[in-house]
Design a protein with these regions (language model features):
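Functional surface patches built around histidine and acidic residues
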Residues: 21-165
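Bacterial N-terminal signal peptides that target proteins for export
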Residues: 1-8
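C-terminal motif of bacterial Sec signal peptides marking the signal peptidase cleavage site
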Residues: 16-20
């Protein structure tokens, strides 16, 4: 008799437990499945930016950084976003960071953004003239990449992301 009364209660407890675990699992899957877009082909201005940054790092006694397709893809999505909203920003940086942690094994993520510069040299020089941007360029990272896109008026937008794996 006691077992017959306990069985429905145990069934309810089990149902609640399984439902709770399923939600935790779904949440973890959502975080781990942040989509990484297809990596766009590198433009000459992007290659030049990466070369200038690595040349600067070498003159400072730092290691050259490796370019990374996943970093480029994530940077590209942010550059497209800045063009879409017509504003230079670090909006949604935490999402880019989570994506790179999940998809590029990044432990540390930082970024520089820019707008309106007409050449690779001018945007890199502007970043180097800014203490916070220069700190990112000189940081202890392993990989980086950059996205440069023009809006409909021909103005350039830049996103440069650094990671340490």
């Amino acid at each position: 008799m006691k077992a017959a009364k306990l069985l429905p209660i145990l069934a309810i407890v089990a149902l609640i437990s399984f439902t709770s675990c399923a939600n935790d699992s779904e949440e973890n899957e959502a975080i781990n499945s942040i989509e990484v877009p297809v990596t766009p082909q590198a433009k000459s201005i992007e290659i030049e930016i990466m070369e200038l940054i690595n040349a600067y790092r070498i003159t400072e006694g730092l290691n050259a950084l490796n370019n990374h397709n996943t970093v480029k893809a994530v940077a590209s999505t942010h550059t497209d976003y800045m063009i879409e909203v017509n504003n230079v920003s670090h909006d949604n940086f935490f999402l880019r960071k989570q994506s790179l942690q999940a998809n590029a094994s990044a432990n540390i993520v930082t970024e520089n953004v820019g707008y309106g510069f007409s050449s690779a040299e001018s945007v890199v020089n502007a970043w180097l003239a800014s203490p916070s941007h220069r700190e990112n360029i000189e940081g202890d990272y392993t990989d980086f990449d950059v996205s440069a896109e023009q809006n409909s008026a021909g103005k350039w937008y830049f996103t440069n992301i650094f990671i340490k794996r």
